[in-house]
């Protein structure tokens, strides 16, 4: 994947302002609420019976932070995202058997969360760069499935 200097700047500039714990928890919670069938991968998380339960679930919050923290590795390694996520791809494919479509869904939700948090700063150009990034990350995570 080729990144322009502008795309790199838009991604890293916004990433520097992201509250990883808050945005990560919100993104994962939204995934579980908007696409409830994804909850089957999180049966060990306890009560996911309602949006309120999901939003208040400490395991959702902790895992959301973990997910977005690892997403930060993509931001730091834009030119080697496939390598950066090869172990996570193996884990999610071989051990967890996660449907790779869920990576795309989570990426799209992350874009929604960033738009909600950053408003006018999340310009169409910024959105395009982030949409490209989440697509590349989803593809890297799905790599072991192919």
Swiss-Prot record:
Domain of life: Eukaryota
Binding residues annotated for heme b, in chain numbering: 63, 92
Keyword ATP-binding: no
Domain Globin: 2-146
Gene Ontology CC terms: blood microparticle; haptoglobin-hemoglobin complex; hemoglobin complex
Tissue spec: Red blood cells.
GO molecular function: haptoglobin binding; heme binding; metal ion binding; organic acid binding; oxygen binding; oxygen carrier activity; peroxidase activity
Keywords: Heme, Iron, Metal-binding, Oxygen transport, Transport
InterPro entries hit by this protein: Globin, Globin-like_sf, Globin/Proto, Hemoglobin_b, Hemoglobin_oxygen_transport
GO biological process, one term: hydrogen peroxide catabolic process
Assembly information from the UniProt record: Heterotetramer of two alpha chains and two beta chains.
Family recorded in the similarity comment: Belongs to the globin family.
Physiological role: Involved in oxygen transport from the lung to the various peripheral tissues.
Protein name: Hemoglobin subunit beta
Name of the gene: HBB
């Amino acid at each position: 994947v080729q990144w322009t200097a502008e795309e790199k700047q838009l991604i890293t500039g916004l990433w520097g302002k992201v509250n990883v714990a808050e945005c990560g928890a919100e993104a994962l919670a939204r995934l579980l609420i908007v696409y409830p069938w994804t909850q089957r991968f999180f049966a060990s998380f306890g009560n996911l019976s309602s949006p309120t339960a999901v939003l208040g679930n400490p395991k959702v919050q902790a895992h959301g932070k973990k997910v977005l923290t690892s997403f930060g590795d993509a931001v730091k390694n834009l030119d080697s995202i496939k390598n950066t996520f090869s172990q996570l791809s193996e884990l999610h494919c071989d051990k967890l058997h996660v449907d790779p479509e869920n990576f795309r869904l989570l990426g799209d939700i992350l874009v929604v969360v960033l738009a909600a948090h950053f408003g006018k700063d999340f310009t169409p150009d910024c959105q395009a760069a982030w949409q490209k990034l989440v697509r590349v990350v989803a593809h890297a995570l799905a790599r072991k499935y192919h």
